[in-house]
From Swiss-Prot:
Species this chain originates from: Methanocaldococcus jannaschii (strain ATCC 43067 / DSM 2661 / JAL-1 / JCM 10045 / NBRC 100440)
The UniProt record lists the keyword Ribonucleoprotein: yes
Function, in words: Involved in targeting and insertion of nascent membrane proteins into the cytoplasmic membrane. Binds directly to 7S RNA and mediates binding of the 54 kDa subunit of the SRP.
Descriptive protein name: Signal recognition particle 19 kDa protein
GO biological process: SRP-dependent cotranslational protein targeting to membrane
GO MF terms, alphabetically ordered: 7S RNA binding
Pfam families (alphabetical): SRP19
Encoding gene, per UniProt annotation: srp19
Keywords: Cytoplasm, Ribonucleoprotein, RNA-binding, Signal recognition particle
GO CC annotation: signal recognition particle
Length: 87
């Protein structure tokens, strides 16, 4: 499963790729934050810093790959909760 920062970015609209509700979304999520959250969930993420999200192909944002067979939206919500919990 691939996770792009845009999926949980509060500044992005649904059209731009945000998948979680705005109240759960994170301002400027970093690959490092996503990686740490996934590790807290017991998963082993792989970071790809040079990848471009297809909807914003002009900017290099990177992505995270994780071997997860469950519901993607539920995982994204859990990532947001963990990242917000650190603040």
């Amino acid at each position: 499963m691939i996770i792009w920062p845009s999926y949980i970015d509060k500044k992005k609209s649904r059209r731009e790729g945000r998948k979680v509700p705005e109240e759960l979304a994170i301002e400027k999520p970093s690959l490092k934050d996503i990686e740490k959250a996934l590790k807290k969930l017991g998963l082993e993420p792989k970071i790809y810093r040079d990848k471009r999200y297809p909807r914003q192909h002009w900017e290099i944002c990177g992505c995270v790959e994780v071997d997860y067979k469950g519901n993607k939206l539920q995982l994204l919500k859990e990532i947001c909760k963990i990242i917000k919990g650190k603040n």
